[in-house]
Amino acid sequence: MTRALAVEWGPHGVTVNAIAPGYMMTPDNMGNALRADPVQRARFADRTALRRWGQAHELDGAVIYLAGEAGAYCTGHTLVVDGGMTVKI
């Protein structure tokens, strides 16, 4: 969808990008069962190259880049911010 919208809206000067976050430690992601189970939390963390959960603020740079002047020539891109989870697959 990101790529299709980038093609459709590009001629109008609109950039369309996406951010694909990995495991982020947020209240919504840390449900009661996961919050109560440190072993399960560690299993999820071990799936990333950095061996930890991400913090929501670690997405800030990606948002600022894609929304700002530095990312003005970037469109149709999905920026993966996952602590290296996809490189371990």
Residue ranges and their predicted role:
Residues 63-64, 75-89:
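Short C-terminal tail/terminal secondary-structure segment
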Residues 1-5, 9, 19, 66:
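Hydrophobic alpha-helix immediately C-terminal to the catalytic Tyr-X-X-X-Lys motif of short-chain
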Residues 4, 60-61:
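Alpha-helical macromolecular-interaction surfaces
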Residues 48-59, 70:
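A conserved structural motif in NAD(P)-dependent oxidoreductases
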Residues 10, 15, 74-76:
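Short, small/polar-rich loop/turn modules that mediate ligand/substrate recognition or access, typified
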Residues 15-25, 67-70, 80-82:
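Conserved SDR Rossmann-fold cofactor-binding beta-strand/turn motif
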Residues 11, 23-48:
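A glycine/serine/threonine-rich, flexible loop-to-helix segment
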